[in-house]
Swiss-Prot record:
Name this polypeptide is given: Trigger factor
Domain PPIase FKBP-type: 169-256
Enzyme class: isomerase
Keywords, sorted A to Z: Cell cycle, Cell division, Chaperone, Cytoplasm, Isomerase, Rotamase
Enzyme Commission (EC) number: 5.2.1.8
Gene name as annotated: tig
UniProt-recorded Gene Ontology molecular function terms: peptidyl-prolyl cis-trans isomerase activity; protein folding chaperone; ribosome binding
InterPro entries reported in the protein's UniProt record: PPIase_dom_sf (IPR046357), PPIase_FKBP_dom (IPR001179), Trig_fac (IPR005215), Trigger_fac_C (IPR008880), Trigger_fac_C_sf (IPR037041), Trigger_fac_ribosome-bd_bac (IPR008881), Trigger_fac_ribosome-bd_sf (IPR036611), Trigger_fact/SurA_dom_sf (IPR027304)
Domain of life: Bacteria
Length: 461
């Protein structure tokens, strides 16, 4: 079988295949024999009907079309193997099947054109001496105070409030029922009993918590409110509503004292001073990690700007599918029903967002891999083995050795490539908030699902 290749756009390899007459005949005869062997024709036992009757019963043109389809499929697989083409998939016939069927005569040669996706060629521009600017994430002592305050909030207990009206910061226990102002119909999910809400701005739709402030326990009121125009549940966006609210109880947070006893209760440290020292070191390490992440993102962005690659559709589609599944799992872990995001109406926009993210991720990955090949950057297996041991100590679930090895190898190789690029680039560290020129700044990780909604139509903001 004669095969000639030609490069096509989008990292496709064009194949011009010439099939010998004997092979075109074999494809047809094999199909006829197989059909005769399994044919069930009235008046004949399976496989006993004569050839002409089988051809007449199933239709000569139908059998010829099926034989051609089989011939094309087997010839393409043979051509890819014969030419040692690293196919990614997405085999496509470039000729019209109907036109080929008109030319196909069993026993006569047949030529056709096809295409297959292959690994893209990555062309690196100037990847040494990149000029990179990125911002520092500073450590601030206030972060430790904020974290300790969060711990106090988590250990806070609610105690009853008596003899005064509701104030900002109280936790109110209320009954409420919402109706639409226009027709008086109940708002689905807009009713609750013994509902606890902290009286802080922004906890519910504008005006709800504010309307409770000043109420006495046992009082009732009616709040005339409006759902925001960008409310997640579209049927309520911009809708005027009335909420009948009854204040049943008031509570206030009682925070634990910040002392050595508190430190011992929430950690392995015996003193508050030791806990503070640990948190300070932790915050400093996190700030350094974020600063490095900014550096890495800026390097990658500059590298991609110097890289040319024509992405094949197969790789893009695989990456889109991976991102979609990842987003689906992330939403579930956040307690959000993915079907509320991946709706039929939203899917075109979601797919477009995923596609852009997928192409960017692929370009980054391919560019880094090309640098590794060009500079012979590798990770020693001893290093991978040591990293696997570390990962196992951090993981709670059982993960296969192969999966851990692949993850560790990829993680460590990426780190080595970025360190090499950093050593061979001109890097400028900017102050927090200082403007960074387009093209040299940091890329935030792509987020797919935005505007996640609560399952109930309660007056949440």
């Amino acid at each position: 079988m004669k095969v000639t290749q030609e490069k096509l756009p989008r990292s496709q390899m064009g194949l011009n295949v010439e099939v010998e007459g004997e092979k075109s005949k074999q494809a047809y005869e094999k199909l006829v024999r197989d059909t005769m062997r399994t044919a069930r024709i009235p008046g004949f036992r399976p496989g006993k009907a004569p050839r002409q009757l089988v051809l007449q019963f199933y239709g000569k043109e139908r059998l010829r079309a099926q034989a051609l389809e089989n011939l094309i499929d087997s010839s393409l697989k043979e051509a890819i193997e014969q030419e040692s083409i690293a196919s990614l998939g997405n085999l496509q016939l470039r000729d019209s099947f109907e036109e080929l069927l008109g030319r196909y005569q069993p026993g006569e040669p047949l030529s056709f054109k096809a295409a297959v996706d292959v690994q893209p060629e990555v062309q690196l521009g100037t990847y040494t001496g990149l000029t990179v600017r990125y911002s520092e994430v500073p450590y601030e002592a206030k972060q430790v105070d904020d974290q300790l305050e969060q711990y106090r909030e988590q250990r806070a207990v609610l105690v009853p409030v008596e003899g005064r009206a509701a104030e900002v910061g109280d936790t109110a226990v209320i009954d409420f029922a919402g109706t639409k102002a226009a027709d008086g119909n109940e708002i689905v999910g807009g009713k609750a009993t013994d509902f606890e809400v902290e009286l802080l701005p922004g906890r519910l739709i504008a005006g709800f918590t504010e309307g409770i402030i000043g109420m006495q326990i046992g009082e009732s009121t009616e709040l005339a409110l409006r759902f925001p125009d960008d409310y997640p549940q579209q049927e309520l966006a911009g809708v005027d509503a009335k909420f009948a609210v009854s204040l049943k109880d008031l509570k206030i947070k009682e925070l634990p004292v910040l002392d050595d006893d508190f430190a011992g209760d929430i950690s392995e440290f015996e003193t508050l001073e030791a806990l503070r020292a640990f948190l300070e070191q932790q915050q400093q390490e996190q700030a350094a990690e974020k600063t490095r992440a900014n550096r890495d993102a800026a390097i990658i962005k500059a590298l991609v700007a110097e890289t040319t690659v024509d992405l094949p559709e197969t790789l893009v589609n695989r990456e889109v599918q991976f991102l979609a599944e990842q987003s689906f799992r992330n939403l579930q872990q956040q307690g959000i029903d993915p079907s509320r995001i991946f709706t039929e109406e939203n899917m075109p926009r979601v797919r477009e967002t995923l596609r852009v993210d997928a192409e960017n991720r692929l370009k980054r990955t391919l560019a880094l891999a090309q640098v590794a090949r060009a500079e012979n950057i590798v990770v020693e297996e001893e290093q991978v083995a040591a990293r696997i041991v570390e990962l196992r100590s951090e993981l709670e679930e059982e993960v296969s050795e192969q999966a851990l090895a692949e993850f560790a190898r990829e993680e460590m190789l990426t780190e080595k490539i970025l360190e090499w690029l950093a050593e061979h680039s001109t890097i400028e560290l900017t102050l927090p908030g200082e403007a960074i020129e387009p093209g040299s700044g940091e890329d935030a990780p792509p987020e797919v699902a935005a505007g996640a909604t609560e399952p109930e139509a309660q007056p949440n903001s």
